């Protein structure tokens, strides 16, 4: 039985300008994900987040979805068991606890308001229902020197590389010195009811450059069964 470990990282950079936080949901936030295969079964991924409003939660979900799709493109998910380990309780609960009820309610809350991040959650949930995929919450950033922690650091590097590249390439919006206080703070993402439900980009492109500090950890363990032949 082939055991394939996939480590993911996501990063959302926060910019400071005029004593305002430029990141995590505001215009100018930049993010990236990193996917690392310690045993080299697949090529590592360092990818910018370019799916609209950039927040921690959206980048977390995108990292999970992209990894599942990347594995699906290279392996037969019908013959695989995928374990997704993450320190993001939001991501775990969104799929394993809340998605079932939301799907029956046309992806709306009990109040009738559309759920946030539907474009990621709905597709992840479809994979979760149709394939052998499980989620587990784990503690992150243990600071250990074991092989798994070292591999995790490489995933950190990949994510930070992508986030830094995204920050460099993105035009950052800043208020003018004469702008009103109100305008200078209007850089938050629109509410979930106004989000554009775009489709995550299924790319096979890879890139890697210098890194940055990290945020949340994702680990995916894939067990691929041997051929019956």
Swiss-Prot record:
SUPFAM superfamilies xref list: Ribonuclease H-like
Which GO MF terms are attached to this record?
Answer: metal ion binding; nucleic acid binding; RNA-DNA hybrid ribonuclease activity
Q: Per the UniProt entry, what are the Gene Ontology biological process annotations, in alphabetical order?
A: DNA replication, removal of RNA primer
InterPro entries named among the record's database cross-references: RNase_H, RNaseH-like_sf, RNaseH_domain, RNaseH_sf
Name what cofactor the protein needs: a divalent metal cation
Q: Where is the signal peptide?
A: none
What CDD domains does the database record attribute to this sequence?
RNase_HI_eukaryote_like
Reaction catalysed by this enzyme: Endonucleolytic cleavage to 5'-phosphomonoester
Q: Which family does it belong to?
A: Belongs to the RNase H family.
Q: What does this protein do?
A: Endonuclease that specifically degrades the RNA of RNA-DNA hybrids.
Q: Would you tell me the protein name for this molecule?
A: Probable ribonuclease H
């Amino acid at each position: 039985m082939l055991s394939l470990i996939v480590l993911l990282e996501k990063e959302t950079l926060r910019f400071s300008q005029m004593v305002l936080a430029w990141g995590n949901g505001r215009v100018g936030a930049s993010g990236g994900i990193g996917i690392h295969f310690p045993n080299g079964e697949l090529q590592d991924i360092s990818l910018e987040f370019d799916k609209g409003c950039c927040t921690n939660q959206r980048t977390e979900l995108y990292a999970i979805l992209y990894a599942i799709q990347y594995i699906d493109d290279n392996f037969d998910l019908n013959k695989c068991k995928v374990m997704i380990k993450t320190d993001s309780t939001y991501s775990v609960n969104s799929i394993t606890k809340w998605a079932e009820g939301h799907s029956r309610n046309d992806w709306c809350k009990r109040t009738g308001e559309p759920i946030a991040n539907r474009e990621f959650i709905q597709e992840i949930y479809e994979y979760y229902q149709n394939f052998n995929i499980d989620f587990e919450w784990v503690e992150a950033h243990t600071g250990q020197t074991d092989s798994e922690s070292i591999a995790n650091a490489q995933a950190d590097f990949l994510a930070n590389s992508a986030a830094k590249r995204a920050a460099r390439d993105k035009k950052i919006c800043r208020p003018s010195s004469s702008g009103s206080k109100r305008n200078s703070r209007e850089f938050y993402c629109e509410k979930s009811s106004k989000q554009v439900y775009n489709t995550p980009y299924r790319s096979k492109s890879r890139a890697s450059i210098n890194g940055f500090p990290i945020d949340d950890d994702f680990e995916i363990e894939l067990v691929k069964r041997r051929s019956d032949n």
